Regions:
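Ribokinase/PfkB-type carbohydrate-kinase core domain
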Residues: 1-120, 125, 154, 160, ...
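Conserved post-catalytic alpha-helical subdomain immediately downstream of the catalytic base
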Residues: 97-100, 125-172
Length: 172
């Protein structure tokens, strides 16, 4: 968890952060890497997250984290800024994400296959009022579905659906 694990967020002379060094080492041994982070309203995203993205295969963030990392406003008081989503995903790719960049929100999941340029949007499920009992762990559940799809070598579109399904299972 970037921005949460103090030791891994510390600077590293060669890699930028200790987390980036861990990810680089994993990739050196042909392991696929993924990052998660916590949402914060600070300005540590460039210093802590950017170095890690150079060694990241799969990046799955929410709209708050996506805005913090990219500097592109992905939401406002009225909701998601749809017109900025692809730009946000492209910025994650530019920062180093190698395979999939994904941004999820209550309304939609958006994904960019960084290898092919494929952009996908998958709307959230329409559920009856009161169906969702809580949102604690929602982002973690979504991420687990995405990573399962990656492990199964599914498409990025299917990965977004897997993420939504995992989220649904933990929210009731």
């Amino acid at each position: 968890y970037l921005l949460l694990l103090g030791t891994l967020d510390q600077p590293d002379e060669d890699y930028g952060t200790k987390a980036a060094k861990v990810l680089a080492t994993a990739q050196k041994y042909e392991m696929e890497t993924s990052v998660d982070m916590v949402s914060e309203e600070g300005n540590r995203y460039p210093k802590v997250v950017w170095p890690a993205l150079k060694y990241t295969d799969y990046c799955v963030v929410n709209e708050v984290e996506g805005t913090g990392v990219t500097g592109i406003q992905l939401y406002d008081k009225d909701g998601i800024k749809e017109e900025n989503m692809r730009k946000g995903l492209e910025k994650l790719k530019e920062l180093g994400v190698k395979k999939w960049a994904i941004i999820h929100s209550p309304a939609c999941g958006y994904g960019l296959n960084c290898q092919t340029g494929e952009f996908v949007k998958v709307p959230s499920f329409k559920l009856p009022k009161g169906f969702i009992k809580g949102t604690t762990g929602a982002g973690d559940a979504f991420c687990s579905g995405v990573l399962y799809a990656a492990y199964q070598r599914e498409s990025i579109e299917k990965a977004l659906y897997y993420g939504l399904q995992a989220l649904l299972e933990t929210s009731r």
